[in-house]
């Protein structure tokens, strides 16, 4: 049995998405889901309809790859050992494909985060800076980089780690900071 915190494989997420008739890539789906959860939203069965902005999309069936993706992502974000991981491209993908997947993931994350946090108070100064940095990555493309495999591979891994930690910081900001839900008085 897979660990509840283990993300499904990219290809499995892609295949199930296609079988459901969804025109979304695995990195885009995971980025949107991660943004929604990091911003404090998506705690119900309608998370998929929310991130796809389509009320007609059914919730993933119990035990499905997409339901496991949701459960693993939510568990990773809450893990005290900071286990959160990005679902990007397959291990054998080219550097350009990995970079494209990361930039696509960032664009989707911002959309999901906006869905969750749109009506909440402002983030901390650090949270605002992180969002600006993620927005810059979301606007990037592989054409912006000299794709020297050895040098750029290390740089891409550093950027992936930055994004991973940025998501955890934004999630923490929304849990304990100004965008956390406030009690009504």
From Swiss-Prot:
Top-level taxon: Bacteria
InterPro entries noted in UniProt: YgfB-like (IPR011978), YgfB-like_sf (IPR036255)
SUPFAM superfamilies hit by this protein: YgfB-like
Gene Ontology CC terms, in alphabetical order: cytosol
Family: Belongs to the UPF0149 family.
Protein name: UPF0149 protein XF_2010
Species the sequence originates in: Xylella fastidiosa (strain 9a5c)
